[in-house]
C-alpha cells in the first residue's frame, strides 16, 4: 500500500516538473519567433520572473489568493513565474 502511494506521488511530482519545463520551453520558443535579440530576451525573462514572484509573494503574505496581476501582455503567472500564454 505504501509503495503504491509513493509511486503515485512520485509520478505526480515528475508530471508537474515536466509540465513546467514544457511551458518554459514553449514560452521561450514563442519569444524567439518574434525575433528578439538574446540580450533583450534575457532582460524580459528576468523582469517578468521578478515582477511575478514579488507580486505573488506580496499577495500570499496578506493571506489572499495569488491573482498574479503583474503578468500582462500575453503572459500568465504559474508557479511564481511568468509564462507566455
From Swiss-Prot:
Subcellular localization is given as: Secreted
**Keyword terms, alphabetized:** Disulfide bond, Neurotoxin, Postsynaptic neurotoxin, Secreted, Signal, Toxin
Q: Which cysteines are joined by disulfide bonds?
A: 52-66, 56-77, 71-82
Identify the main location: secreted
What tissue expression does the UniProt record report for this protein?
Answer: Expressed by the venom gland.
Signal peptide segment = 1-22
User: Which residues are propeptide?
Assistant: 23-48
* Cellular component, GO annotation: extracellular region; host cell postsynaptic membrane
A GO molecular function term, named singly, is: toxin activity
Q: Name one Pfam family in it.
A: Toxin_20
Family (UniProt): Belongs to the neurotoxin 12 (Hwtx-2) family. 02 (Hwtx-2) subfamily.
Query: Main role?
Result: Postsynaptic neurotoxin.
Indicate what this protein is called per its UniProt record: U4-theraphotoxin-Hhn1d
**Source organism of this protein record:** Cyriopagopus hainanus
Amino acid at each position: 500500500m505504501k509503495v503504491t502511494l509513493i509511486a503515485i506521488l512520485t509520478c505526480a511530482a515528475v508530471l508537474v516538473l515536466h509540465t513546467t519545463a514544457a511551458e518554459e520551453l514553449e514560452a521561450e520558443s514563442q519569444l524567439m519567433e518574434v525575433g528578439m535579440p538574446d540580450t533583450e530576451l534575457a532582460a524580459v525573462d528576468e523582469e517578468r520572473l521578478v515582477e511575478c514572484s514579488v507580486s505573488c509573494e506580496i499577495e500570499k503574505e496578506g493571506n489572499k489568493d495569488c491573482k498574479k496581476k503583474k503578468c500582462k501582455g500575453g503572459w500568465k503567472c504559474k508557479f511564481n513565474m511568468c509564462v507566455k500564454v
